[in-house]
């Protein structure tokens, strides 16, 4: 079972990713031209939601899924995907004022719409929020692996290693 703090971060991140999916689906639904950046943003949000929230939900019921190495790899991939999606969308829209008519007309993602401008800027913000949460989770998972090992055993740099039993046995050992 995962810790309460880990579950709380997963819930907050799921909310950010659901909001991002809503914003990106609004962009996809109103587009007149194909945009690979917007499509990648949708992939990154759905992948993050499935691997983070669904895997976390299942790991709470099946403890065999709570391997720190698997959690670290999934969190790292989610960090990379959300960072790349946020950066690609931010570079694509250039984040100018949504009242600038020349900017609205010349941008291939915004396509002349003020509402698409606001949606894309909000999506960038929520992707970066999610990216930051994944970075925190990668850091915590790395520290957990260093203490407890990659598969939950005490093979890491743990200070809590079992002491060698030497000498006369105590009453609890008899």
Swiss-Prot record:
User: Key word Membrane present in the record?
Assistant: yes
What is the topology of this protein in the membrane according to its UniProt annotation? Multi-pass membrane protein
User: Matching InterPro entries, A to Z?
Assistant: Marvel, NCE102-like
Provide the Gene Ontology terms for cellular component: cell periphery; eisosome; plasma membrane
Extracellular side: which ranges?
29-41, 91-122
Question: What family does the entry list?
Answer: Belongs to the NCE102 family.
Q: Record's PANTHER family?
A: NON-CLASSICAL EXPORT PROTEIN 2-RELATED
This protein's name: Non-classical export protein 2 homolog 1
Upper lineage: Eukaryota, Fungi, Dikarya, Ascomycota, Saccharomycotina
| Gene that encodes the chain | FHN1
């Amino acid at each position: 079972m995962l810790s309460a703090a880990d579950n709380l971060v997963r819930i907050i991140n799921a909310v950010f990713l659901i909001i991002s999916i809503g914003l990106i689906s609004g962009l996809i639904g109103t587009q007149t031209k194909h945009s690979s950046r917007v499509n990648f943003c949708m992939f990154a949000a759905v992948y993050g939601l499935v691997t983070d929230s669904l895997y976390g939900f299942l790991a709470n019921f099946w403890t065999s899924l709570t391997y720190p190495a698997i959690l670290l790899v999934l969190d790292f991939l989610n960090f990379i995907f959300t960072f790349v999606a946020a950066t690609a969308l931010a570079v694509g829209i250039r984040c100018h004022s949504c009242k600038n008519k020349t900017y609205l007309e010349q941008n291939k993602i915004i396509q002349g719409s003020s509402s698409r401008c606001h949606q894309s800027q909000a999506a960038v913000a929520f992707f970066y929020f999610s990216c930051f949460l994944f970075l925190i989770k990668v850091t915590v998972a790395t520290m957990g692996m260093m203490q407890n090992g990659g598969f939950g055993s005490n093979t890491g740099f743990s200070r809590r290693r079992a002491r060698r039993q030497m000498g006369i046995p105590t009453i609890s050992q008899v």
